[in-house]
C-alpha cells in the first residue's frame, strides 16, 4: 500500500498564488496526497471559503490569528493524516510529478530526517534558487543556497546531504515529528526553518537535497523582497537564532557584536545609497 503525503501550505492574502499552486498539483502530481491549506488570518475573511468552494476535496483551516510561518504549518500538521508531511509554500508551481522522488529519498536511509527538492525561479524556470545549502557562519549567521541565481545546466543532478533545507518545500516523515518536534513558533517569520533543521540534526538525523524532485518558486511573494516586515524579522531573528544555537559564549558575543555594528552599518549604507530610507528604522526595531 502506498503511503500518503500530507501537503501543508499557508495562505495569507495570497488567494491567486494558492489557487495556482493547487491547480498545478492537480494537473501534474499523481502520487497519493492530501492538501491542507491553513488560512493565516487573511484580511479578507472570505478567502478560505472561496478556496473551499473551488477545491471541495481539500481541507481549508481558518485561523483567526496570524500564527506566522511556523505556527501556521504546525496547525496544518495537527490535521494531517499522511505518513509523510510536505510543508510547501503557496507561491510555488509544480510542472511535473515530484512527491515520489522526495518519498524515495526519505525512505532510502532511516537517518534522513528532512528532504528539499531542487528549487528554481518562476517564471524564469532555468534560473536556480536552491540546490542545497552551505553551512552557516557562526559569526555572520548567514549561509548561501548552493546554485542560487545560476542557470540550471545539469550541474546539480546528484542528491547529497546538506546543511539546511529550503523553507519553500520541506518533506519529513510524520512519525519523526515526535523525535525532533514541530517548528519553533517564536520567530514568526524567517529563521524558523533553519532552527528546525538544527534541531533535526541534533537528533542525529540528516538533511538532504533531492534533484529528481523540482519545483518553481515565486520568491517572497507574500511579504515582498525588501519589505519592512522582511527587514525587521531578519534582523530580530538572527539575534534569537544566535542565542539558541551558539553554545559557546565567546562566539555568541562575537556574533552579537558583528550583527549590531558591522552588519547594521552596512545595511544602513546600502539603504541610504538606494534611497530606501523608510527601511532603516526597521533595522533598529529588530535590534
Residue ranges and their predicted role:
Residues 32-41, 59-63:
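Short beta-strand/loop segment that forms part of the nucleotide-sugar
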Residues 23-32:
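Short, acidic, metal-binding catalytic loop of nucleotide-sugar glycosyltransferases
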Residues 44-45, 92-105:
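Acidic donor-binding/catalytic loop of UDP-sugar-dependent glycosyltransferases
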Residues 71, 101-186, 194:
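Acidic/His-rich active-site region of diverse nucleotide-sugar glycosyltransferases
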Residues 229-236, 248-287:
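Non-catalytic, C-terminal membrane-associated alpha-helical segments of glycosyltransferases
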Residues 174-189, 194-216:
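Catalytic donor-sugar/metal-binding loop of nucleotide-sugar-dependent glycosyltransferases
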Residues 85:
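Short aromatic/hydrophobic "clamp" motif used to bind/position activated sugar donors
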Residues 62-80, 90:
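Glycine-rich, basic loop-to-helix element that forms the pyrophosphate-binding segment
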Amino acid at each position: 500500500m502506498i503511503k500518503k503525503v500530507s501537503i501543508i501550505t499557508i495562505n495569507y492574502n495570497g488567494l491567486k498564488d494558492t489557487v495556482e499552486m493547487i491547480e498545478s498539483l492537480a494537473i501534474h502530481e499523481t502520487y497519493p496526497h492530501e492538501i491542507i491549506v491553513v488560512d493565516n488570518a487573511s484580511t479578507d475573511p472570505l478567502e478560505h471559503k472561496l478556496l473551499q468552494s473551488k477545491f471541495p476535496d481539500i481541507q481549508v483551516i481558518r485561523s483567526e490569528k496570524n500564527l506566522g510561518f511556523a505556527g501556521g504549518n504546525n496547525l496544518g500538521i495537527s490535521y494531517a493524516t499522511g505518513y509523510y508531511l510536505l510543508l510547501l509554500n503557496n507561491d510555488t508551481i509544480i510542472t511535473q510529478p515530484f512527491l515520489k522522488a522526495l518519498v524515495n529519498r526519505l525512505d532510502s536511509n532511516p537517518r534522513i530526517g528532512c528532504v528539499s527538492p531542487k528549487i528554481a525561479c518562476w517564471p524564469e524556470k532555468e534560473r536556480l534558487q536552491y540546490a542545497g545549502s552551505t553551512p552557516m557562519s557562526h559569526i555572520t549567521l548567514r549561509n548561501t543556497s548552493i546554485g542560487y541565481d545560476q542557470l540550471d545546466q545539469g550541474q546539480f543532478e546528484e542528491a547529497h546531504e546538506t546543511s539546511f533545507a529550503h523553507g519553500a518545500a520541506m518533506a519529513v516523515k510524520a512519525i519523526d515529528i515526535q523525535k525532533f518536534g514541530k517548528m519553533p513558533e517564536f520567530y514568526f517569520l524567517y529563521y524558523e526553518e533553519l532552527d528546525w533543521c538544527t534541531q533535526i540534526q541534533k537528533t542525529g538525523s540528516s538533511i538532504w537535497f533531492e534533484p529528481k524532485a523540482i519545483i518553481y518558486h515565486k520568491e517572497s511573494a507574500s511579504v515582498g523582497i525588501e519589505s519592512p516586515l522582511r527587514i525587521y524579522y531578519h534582523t530580530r531573528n538572527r539575534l534569537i537564532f544566535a542565542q539558541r544555537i551558539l553554545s559557546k559564549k565567546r562566539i555568541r558575543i562575537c556574533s552579537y557584536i558583528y550583527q549590531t555594528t558591522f552588519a547594521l552599518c552596512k545595511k544602513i549604507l546600502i539603504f541610504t545609497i538606494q534611497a530606501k530610507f523608510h527601511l532603516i528604522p526597521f533595522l533598529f526595531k529588530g535590534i
